Amino acid sequence: MTTSEKRRRLIEAAVDLFTEHGIHATSLADIAKRADVPLGNVYYYFKTKDDLARAVFAHRAWEIDQLTENLDRYASPAERLREFLLFVAHHADGYTRNGCPIGRLCQEMNMATPLSDEVARLFGAVLTWLEGQFRQLGAADSRRQAVHLLGAVQGAILLAKTFRDESLLKAEMERLAQAV
């Protein structure tokens, strides 16, 4: 296995485990085991758990970029917003099981630290993209609309996870998509 392959596997394992259990409940040993990499190799690539967390944040930022690039291929902002909501509905199983991976990171990084600022930028990227869609629709209060929609999505994810019922999330995303 190449060094870049080991690093990639460690990041992917951390992404999965942070989503499933959270940052604080996941040890570096857990990550090494999931990645099938010796524990000592973790320290070769990441000097601290914070360094690994930053790599996870960068991976999540890349995922957000990929999502918004794909959504931007739709012709109108209304279509893009609907497709965003249908994307969430399509992934209802994972959100119901683990919650929103970005939301979970933000909740864990709730203290004023450099890491909390870094993870907040992930939601900031989503919020900025949503705001741009509402602005293109001509909404005078595009920021407020974006905050409202993101809050509705996060609330629906939380309820689906709480009640272990993905149909709640799917139904709410479909309702919101029809309202756009």
Where do the protein language model's features map onto the residues?
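Helix-turn-helix
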Residues: R9, A13-D51, A55
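Short helix-capping/turn signature of helix-turn-helix
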Residues: F46, R104-M111
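A secondary-structure capping/hinge motif
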Residues: D50-L52, L105, P114
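Hydrophobic alpha-helical connector segments
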Residues: A55, E69-N98, L149
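Amphipathic alpha-helical packing segments from all-alpha helical-bundle domains
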Residues: W62-D65, E69, G94, A112-Q136, ...
